[in-house]
């Protein structure tokens, strides 16, 4: 669980930015996006190999 301490006088925008930054760092949003819809194992496997090829081409 992510907690962001807000001091007296801090703006809500600053607190929201800090929360978003912490969630991105922990990978929460990425996992929510990945589990939003069911994807078949074959599609996961295909995406994984495609990412590996992309990474290999960069190196």
From Swiss-Prot:
Gene3D superfamilies, A to Z: Ribosomal protein S8
Domain of life: Bacteria
Keyword presence, Ribonucleoprotein: yes
Region (Disordered): 40-59
Keyword terms: Ribonucleoprotein, Ribosomal protein
Recorded GO MF terms: structural constituent of ribosome
Entry GO terms, CC: ribonucleoprotein complex; ribosome
Pfam families: Ribosomal_S21 (PF01165)
Keyword Transcription regulation: no
One GO BP annotation of this record: translation
Matches recorded under NCBIfam families: S21p (TIGR00030)
Family recorded in the similarity comment: Belongs to the bacterial ribosomal protein bS21 family.
Protein's name in the database: Small ribosomal subunit protein bS21
Organism of origin: Protochlamydia amoebophila (strain UWE25)
């Amino acid at each position: 669980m992510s907690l962001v301490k807000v001091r007296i006088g801090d703006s809500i925008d600053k607190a929201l930015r800090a929360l978003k930054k912490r969630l991105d760092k922990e990978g929460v949003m990425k996992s929510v996006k990945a589990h939003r819809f069911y994807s078949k194992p074959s599609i996961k496997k295909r995406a994984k190999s495609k990412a590996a090829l992309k990474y290999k081409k960069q190196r």
